[in-house]
Amino acid sequence: MARSSGSSGGISVDRFSVVLVAVAATLWASDAYFRNQLITHLTPTQIVVAEDGLITLFLLPVLIRSVHELRNLGWKGWLAVVIIAAGAQSLATILFTASFQQAATYKVFAETFVLQQTQPLIAIVLAWIVLGERRRPWFWPAVVVAMVGVYLVVFAQDPTAPVSALQQGRVEVGLLALGAALLWASGTVLGRFALGSISFWSMTSLRFTLALPLLVTIVVVQYGTGAFSHYQFSDFVPNLLAIALVPGLLALLLYYRALSRTPASLATIAEMAYPVAATFIASAPPPWGFNQPIYGVQLVGTALLIGVIVLLNLTKERVAEVSATSTLKLAES
């Protein structure tokens, strides 16, 4: 059994580890610039499979060198890694894209985005069930402040949009968005679980390597023998290469390095930097963004989220020394 995260057990959260999770989440949003130049002739799945293939190629030497380390993963650890690869890396993106496309058809975009904001709540519940994480009472008001901050950023133009969208919402749009949120949230918790037995390098390598066969299969099923005929050399240099290196490889290495020393319930709050960063990137002029206006309330919301992330980073929380081969239980921090 893992040691208690009380005063005498566990590992102290690294300085700036929560902030580093937020930085990684911000890097995820940077793919918008490069992705915008690909979506005219490639589908989201085709973009994801090419990105995954490049990163797998980059990390193959790392995976080969760390084969001995993979023996530390018990069946629970392997199950966690497979769920991350198949769910968070593969199916979640497909579900979210499908939800967005359905929302576009019925003009209920806000339904997709507001239900996506359930992800941190799902992750906190899963961290409690899977890892046994317990947070102090002050944590919950901080969560509320962070979610209010993100809400102000995402729905600045019309704060009532989620209410009307949900009232006129479509069941299929909501289920797809919730499915993506569940898979991404489980990726955070199970990633923290697996990192108890393997390094962040190995975790990153396994995530992309195990996801690649599934993604290739999905693309072939969707588009048949011509699934890979739409790629051009100009797609790979610089766009797909940049997506693979920055929001892909660099962001995930940084994310798993920070997650290895951060409770999952704290990391999921820091991940909320992603929709905030994506919103501000969208405000950039073309071709970098969509020239969307910036509202004063968005600056307020951003300040609230940054304040919560800094607060979480300054706390004296401790992370239990977990192992993917053991029963996990975290005492109250």
Predicted feature residues:
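Glycine-/small-residue-enriched transmembrane alpha-helix faces in small-molecule transporters
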Residues: 1-49, 98, 161-196, 279-281, ...
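Transmembrane alpha-helices of multi-pass small-molecule transport proteins
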Residues: 2, 16, 41-91, 120-127, ...
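Juxtamembrane helix-entry segments on the extracytoplasmic side of multipass membrane proteins
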Residues: 13-17, 41-45, 49, 73-79, ...
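Specific transmembrane alpha-helical segments of multi-pass solute transporters/efflux pumps
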Residues: 30-31, 67-110, 152, 244-262
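Hydrophobic/aromatic residues within transmembrane alpha-helices
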Residues: 38, 47, 51, 99, ...
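C-terminal transmembrane-helix exit sites in multi-pass transporters
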Residues: 58-63, 119-144, 276-300
